[in-house]
């Protein structure tokens, strides 16, 4: 804070942990850990008189995540004996609005995903849209000291203040693209330290504030490519960030300067939609396999087990139950794409996974599958004591509802503010 920043921003969410958190409305982060971080950030921001910006609040940015984060913000303000003007920006999209947009042909797939259907929309528990900088800038202009935003384009909360002050949107977004992962763009990388971005008319400088870390041309350039399929063009709300002419310069041991970024506005303003829907209930069992004879013929044995399971439950449609085997140590991470799949490991960590329409059915099928594999015979078997080694007792775990991403599409809008209603309130101690 001695460097006198003009804003403190944090990207608080991601789809990386999977669809469960958006679908269920739960946060993937621990409440006490979030409260600890927000207490430090909010106190520093209020003391310095600068805005605190929280993007994708609660991890996924839907209404329950927003409420969860606002409650923490209020608790922090009360404990600090402070009050603040807090804007929260909603990103939830109603089913009716999206069905209308679908019929008006304003929704298109984002990448290699199927076209959206009315059923996809109706079955989703939460659907959020990814806002750009405009709603955040609007909240700041309305006097917000703290902005708690729903689902955000990751750089948006970092770019909002510079854009509001008239700086290049291209440079502000590119700077935000790197700052959103903090010191991961430094060497050695870490998600636990802050980074400082300083913007001017022609470029920006990134600095690792921890003296044990440093920004290098390689680390900053590499993070520019982070999670992107195209090394030059980075699409986002309202346009495309063009890095074709981008230059990276080492200023000193800890700082890198970036110039040359361009931003091409789209003819039509599009925002990304994300939705998740429940698809059943999951039960898993973890086991180790050490027998080289079993490992050598594992695919055949697992297929035999699967056949026995569905023969035993003859009244169950295969569409009602999904039975999966994940073989860690062989191809558990990459599956059929694993280039070294034929290399026989000395042991395998096996995950038996069942997804069914009820938890009871998932439990039952998983139990039968585990028992069948434990005792099944195979050529060369030397012991009948059991084929599996279980690290836990009980060996099976019920995981509850399973979600999958049901919406990953683009929505064309006339106004970047309309899909994201704002509300201002005073939180903290009573005035």
Label every model-predicted segment:
Residues 5-10, 30-48, 136, 271-273:
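Structured alpha-helical segments in the cores of large, soluble enzyme domains
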Residues 3-20:
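N-terminal glycine-rich anion-binding loops that anchor highly charged ligand groups
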Residues 269-431:
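C-terminal non-catalytic interaction/assembly regions of soluble proteins
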Residues 14-16, 57-67, 151-157, 357-359:
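Gly/Ser/Thr-rich loops at beta-strand to alpha-helix junctions
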Residues 9, 51, 127-128, 157-330:
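Small-residue-enriched flexible segments
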Residues 53-55, 59-82:
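Hydrophobic or amphipathic alpha-helical targeting/insertion segments
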């Amino acid at each position: 804070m001695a460097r006198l920043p003009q804003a403190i921003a944090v990207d608080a969410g991601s789809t990386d942990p999977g669809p469960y958190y958006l679908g269920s409305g739960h946060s993937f982060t621990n409440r006490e850990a979030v409260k600890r971080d927000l207490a430090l950030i909010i106190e520093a921001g209020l003391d310095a008189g600068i805005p605190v910006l929280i993007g994708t609040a609660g991890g996924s940015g839907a209404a329950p995540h927003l409420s969860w984060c606002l409650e923490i913000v209020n608790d922090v303000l009360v404990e600090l004996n402070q009050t603040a003007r807090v804007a929260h920006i909603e990103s939830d999209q109603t089913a009716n609005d999206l069905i209308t947009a679908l019929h008006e042909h304003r929704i298109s797939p984002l990448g290699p995903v199927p076209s959206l259907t009315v059923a996809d929309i109706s079955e989703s528990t939460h659907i959020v849209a990814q806002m750009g900088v405009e709603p955040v800038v609007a909240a700041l202009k309305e006097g917000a000291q703290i902005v708690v935003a729903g689902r955000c384009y990751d750089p948006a909360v970092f770019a909002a203040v510079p854009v509001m002050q008239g700086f290049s949107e291209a440079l502000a977004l590119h700077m935000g693209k790197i700052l959103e992962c903090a010191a991961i763009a430094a060497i050695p990388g870490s998600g636990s330290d802050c980074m400082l971005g300083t913007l001017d008319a022609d470029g920006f400088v990134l600095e690792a504030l921890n003296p044990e870390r440093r920004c290098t041309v390689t680390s900053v350039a590499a993070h520019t490519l982070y999670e992107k399929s195209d090394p030059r063009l980075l699409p986002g709300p309202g346009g495309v960030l063009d890095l074709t002419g981008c230059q990276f310069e080492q200023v000193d041991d800890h700082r890198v300067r970036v110039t040359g970024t361009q931003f091409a506005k789209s003819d039509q303003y599009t925002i990304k939609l994300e939705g998740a829907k429940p698809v059943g209930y999951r039960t898993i069992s973890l086991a180790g396999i050490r027998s080289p004879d079993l490992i050598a013929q594992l695919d055949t044995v697992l297929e035999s087990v699967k056949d026995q399971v569905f023969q035993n439950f003859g009244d169950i449609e295969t569409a009602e139950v999904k039975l999966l085997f994940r073989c860690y140590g062989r191809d558990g991470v990459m599956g059929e794409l694993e280039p070294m799949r034929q290399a026989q490991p000395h042991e395998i960590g096996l995950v038996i996974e069942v997804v069914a329409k009820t938890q009871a059915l998932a439990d039952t099928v998983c139990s039968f599958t585990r028992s069948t594999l434990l005792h099944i015979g195979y050529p060369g078997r030397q012991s009948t004591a059991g084929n599996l080694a279980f690290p836990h007792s009980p060996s099976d775990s019920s995981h509850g509802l399973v979600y999958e991403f049901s919406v990953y599409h683009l929505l064309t809008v006339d106004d970047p503010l309309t899909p994201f209603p704002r509300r201002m309130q005073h939180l903290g101690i009573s005035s």
